[in-house]
């Protein structure tokens, strides 16, 4: 039962990691778009004729990309916090599983010790009874 809980927590953490990687990839795409937009804007300034509408469109798109990048960075930060919490839950679940394993091993050792003690006592009783008969 505890092992199922551990597996569930690990699966949840894995899903968060996948989501985080996707978000980081999307942020990188936004950064690349910003770079390309900046290059296109600079190339517009070097043309013989200035197209104000295109320049304004690139500036507006650049501002949108900045906002998108900031939002994505916030989402990534929140996802990292969520991942840290989930990793803590995984560690706690793993700790519980290990404790139960150790407890089970200890109980098995105690059982076998009691079994062997009972067997030794029976052998001693049989041996004692034999000597008493002779």
Language-model features, listed with the residues they occupy:
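Charge-rich amphipathic alpha-helical interaction elements
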Residues: 1-134
